[in-house]
From Swiss-Prot:
Gene3D superfamilies: Pleckstrin-homology domain (PH domain)/Phosphotyrosine-binding domain (PTB). Residues 593-627 form a coiled coil. Residues 41-55, 620-631 have a biased composition (Low complexity). A 1,2-diacyl-sn-glycero-3-phospho-(1D-myo-inositol-3,5-bisphosphate) binds at N330, N355, I356, S418, D419, G420, W421, D422, R423, R459, R463. Residues 1-12, 23-40, 632-643 have a biased composition (Polar residues). Its EC number is 3.1.3.95. Belongs to the protein-tyrosine phosphatase family. Non-receptor class myotubularin subfamily. This is Phosphatidylinositol-3,5-bisphosphate 3-phosphatase MTMR2. The gene is MTMR2. PANTHER family: MYOTUBULARIN-RELATED (PTHR10807), MYOTUBULARIN-RELATED PROTEIN 2 (PTHR10807:SF42).
Length: 643
């Protein structure tokens, strides 16, 4: 039975209007910190909390006094809409890297915040509640031994956070209840924090992606492809966007018959078209052939129309993301794959990418070997046993084959898995990233995510489990994480081809879980419209695009006309240490590498400027010398001798 994909409870309580802040977001200052990448809060405390009795002090002294007070505060800096729900003093954080540290634990409606003044600078741990997967009680009231009674939070970003409470203090129960309430608001009929957060940014990220503009950039509509509004009310397919691009010679009535033959009504629609050859990438779900091998004349005609729209080739490739054995097994459920007998001039290729359950188990194994400790002696064999990089390789290799067929083969391709919202999104978006330099810019990548993932119905709510306490839900899977990992692998192989840096990718992943922004909420465009997310929440792109300098790759050089062919072999892939092992202070560099790049480039620019100044000075001196040499006072008149 299909699980309900509704997200109506995500914002069950309308957010009250709050005074907008024009300050940008900022991270809490930390040194010995396992701080996740949070947005920034320029206002650390409200103005009411600062005494004004000494206003006669000089401004410098007042600032110094107030900054000292802020350093001593144990409460977290609060975002607009954020408020404290519980606080427990004398709690011990069992840090797996630096040992136990005692401090104050605070729960707000957005974050879990721990601060210890025992160290200099203060130790700060700051995690959004959205990243929490489950909360467990450790020990009972009669537990003996130091730090044997407390709570453990298991997080979606690889971490486990363990806190010890004193049994006599009775703070554990209160903290546990508030964590269960505010970390899982959907399970408690409460709104996600994104509906409470009201920060104002210079740019509205919800307006970043306009499908008409994006299709126009690709040259659509044209004589072979048209934009249809048949799905304007999401009646053809409730998981597809309102606007679809389909073959120009296929009328809307036939689209309905094609939809009845495709799983969930997800017909083949255009994702990308080559600007020269007109070869296309179209995406869809599996055909409903079943064990009896049913056929659909309308579906066969439709794929023929896709092939005919490309005059460069008289063949079409169908890339099925699944292993062939899985595709065959789907026939028993009414699904299946295209028969080459039924679809003339079509070649079917299976890409052997495993399903969401295999990927979830692979990530679980990866977490076991990277957090908290790494076993050096068996590191390579342990990593191999997770099969994580093997899955990354298969996804990249599949996207590479698609891109190569379109670019080198000038052949149109159709891509699908079972339902067309997981592996299909990985493959189409990665292939488009290889083919189109626009998507390798910051804004272009944001458009790519909006288009191929959000508008085409990747089930973010189900795959991530926003605000849902059911951590064992079989629908959870790291599909989008794998896509971002593949992008990172490409940036390693082509360090100057992407406008964005590693921090950009990590920030996207952190806010995939945080529930601070509305971008990744719900499962479809239709659901986001019903929830009115553009009006009730802030877009992640609003935040990112307000401080582009933080996310820009200083080595970027525009390669807009270049097609990237990454090497998809195990020898060229590596574990993304900057993400999966970033919490281990022994494994991360002293400073982010992109900051060092910026410093070196700034130094180079400074030296280039000096060279230019010296060249101008030399040129000026040379000109001055020439002028003096040719002046009348210095001129010697040649003597002509008459013979």
């Amino acid at each position: 039975m299909e699980k309900s994909s509704s997200c109506e409870s995500l914002g069950s309580q309308p957010a009250a209007a709050r005074p907008p802040s024009v300050d940008s977001l900022s991270s809490a200052s930390t040194s010995h910190s396992e701080n996740s990448v949070h947005t920034k809060s320029a206002s650390v405390v409200s103005s009411d909390s600062i005494s004004t009795s000494a206003d006669n002090f000089s401004p410098d002294l007042r600032v110094l006094r107030e900054s000292n007070k802020l350093a001593e505060m144990e409460e977290p800096p609060l975002l607009p809409g954020e408020n404290i729900k519980d606080m427990a003093k004398d709690v011990t954080y069992i840090c797996p890297f630096t040992g136990a540290v005692r401090g104050t634990l605070t729960v707000t409606n957005y974050r879990l915040y721990f601060k210890s003044m025992e160290r200099d600078p203060p130790f700060v741990l700051d995690a959004s509640l959205g990243v929490i997967n489950r909360v467990e009680k450790i020990g009972g009231a009669s537990s003996r031994g130091e730090n044997s009674y407390g709570l453990e939070t298991v997080c979606k970003d690889i971490r486990n956070l363990r806190f010890a409470h004193k049994p006599e203090g009775r703070t554990r129960r209160s903290i546990f209840e508030n964590l269960m309430k505010y970390a899982f608001p959907v399970s408690n009929n409460l709104p996600l924090f994104a509906f409470e957060y009201k920060e104002v940014f210079p740019e509205n990220g919800w307006k970043l992606y306009d499908p008409l503009l994006e299709y126009r950039r690709q040259g659509i509509p044209n004589e072979s492809w048209r934009i249809t509004k048949i799905n304007e009310r999401y009646e053809l397919c409730d998981t597809y966007p309102a606007l679809l691009v389909v073959p120009a010679n296929i009328p809307d009535e036939e689209l309905k018959r094609v939809a009845s033959f495709r799983s969930r009504g997800r017909i083949p629609v255009l994702s990308w078209i080559h600007p020269e050859s007109q070869a296309t990438i179209t995406r869809c779900s599996q055909p409903m052939v079943g064990v009896s091998g049913k056929r659909s004349k309308e579906d066969e005609k439709y794929l023929q129309a896709i092939m005919d729209s490309n005059a460069q080739s008289h063949k079409i490739f169908i890339f099925d993301a699944r292993p062939s054995v899985n595709a065959v097994a789907n026939k028993a459920k009414g699904g299946g794959y295209e028969s080459e007998d039924a679809y003339q001039n079509a070649e079917l290729v299976f890409l052997d990418i495993h399903n969401i359950h295999v990927m979830r188990e692979s990530l679980r194994k990866l977490k076991e070997i990277v957090y908290p400790n790494i076993e050096e002696t068996h590191w390579l064999s342990n990593l191999e046993s997770t099969h994580w990089l093997e899955h990354i390789k298969l996804i990249l290799a599949g996207a590479l084959r698609i891109a190569d067929k379109v670019e080198s083969g000038k052949t149109s391709v159709v891509v699908h898995c079972s339902d067309g919202w997981d592996r299909t999104a990985q493959l189409t978006s990665l292939a488009m990233l290889m083919l189109d330099g626009y998507y390798r810019t910051i804004r272009g990548f944001e458009v790519l995510v909006e288009k191929e993932w959000l508008s085409f119905g990747h089930r973010f709510q189900l795959r991530v489990g926003h605000g849902d306490k059911n951590h064992a839900d079989a629908d959870r899977s790291p599909v989008f994480l794998q896509f971002i990992d593949c992008v990172w692998q490409m940036t390693r192989q082509f360090p100057t081809a992407f406008e964005f840096n590693e921090y950009f990718l990590i920030t996207i992943l952190d806010h995939l879980y945080s529930c601070l922004f509305g971008t990744f909420l719900c499962n479809s465009e239709q659901q986001r419209g019903k929830e009115n997310l553009p009006k009730r929440t802030v877009s992640l792109w609003s935040y990112i695009n307000s401080q582009l300098e933080d996310f820009t790759n200083p080595l970027y050089g525009s390669y807009s006309n270049h097609v990237l062919y990454p090497v998809a072999s195990m020898r060229h892939l590596e574990l993304w240490v900057g993400y999966y092992i970033r919490w281990n202070p022994r494994m991360k560099p002293q400073e982010p590498i992109h900051n060092r790049y910026k410093e070196l480039l700034a130094k180079r620019a400074e030296l280039q400027k000096k060279v230019e100044e010296l060249q101008r000075e030399i040129s000026n001196r040379s000109t001055s010398s020439s002028e003096r040499a040719s002046s009348p006072a210095q001129c010697v008149t040649p003597v002509q001798t008459v013979v």
